[in-house]
A protein has these predicted regions:
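Aromatic-rich, lipid-facing transmembrane alpha helices and their immediate juxtamembrane interface loops
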Residues: 1-174
Length: 174
């Protein structure tokens, strides 16, 4: 099962943004109990997952995941079991993951970090933009709309249906 949400690399916008937001929101919680961090993660993770699902459907007309078959789900967008996973992830990230990443970043020379950050940000911005365009074109193509310009021809050649179905195997048009 693919958890990737971008056409280049095994990157997940949902998980990547969740880690970034968790880092910002939890950085002042180091002295809190694990149960408090867990509860925060359950609530915030569930809210975040619900919003991501709704935004994905609004922007792309696609449902990327559907939890309707789970007990205690809300509109199939989120369910209680996965909210618990978000809580566990919050504790693991704050206590183990982030400290390891911070130590690893300390090994990178100070003058290299800004350039690494800029290059990674540019790559991810291009990757997200291209992924959005490819997904929009895929939706048009499956509706029988032929390419209208060179960009759409490029997208059809490089991001054909088979590739898009590998990247987004669970996506369902609404």
């Amino acid at each position: 099962m693919s958890r990737s949400s971008l056409v280049w690399g095994p990157f997940s916008v949902v998980w990547g943004l969740a880690l970034a937001l968790s880092t910002v929101l939890l950085r002042n919680c180091e002295n809190k109990s694990d149960s408090a961090i867990f509860a925060f993660g359950v609530f915030m993770g569930g809210a975040y997952e619900y919003v991501c699902s709704a935004v994905g459907e609004l922007l792309f007309g696609v449902i990327f995941w559907d939890y309707s078959g789970f007990k205690f789900n809300i509109a199939g967008r989120v369910n209680l079991l996965y909210c618990f996973f978000w809580g566990i992830a919050a504790v693991v990230w704050l206590r183990l993951g982030y400290p390891l990443v911070a130590k690893g970043m300390d090994l990178v020379r100070r003058h290299v970090k800004p350039w690494m950050t800029i290059l990674l940000a540019i790559f991810m911005a291009v990757n997200m933009s291209l992924s959005g365009l490819a997904l929009a074109r895929y939706n048009s193509r499956t509706d029988g709309i032929t390419p209208q310009n060179q960009l759409e021809v490029f997208l059809d050649e490089h991001f054909d249906n088979a590739r898009m179905e590998r990247v987004y195997p669970n996506a369902k048009k609404t």
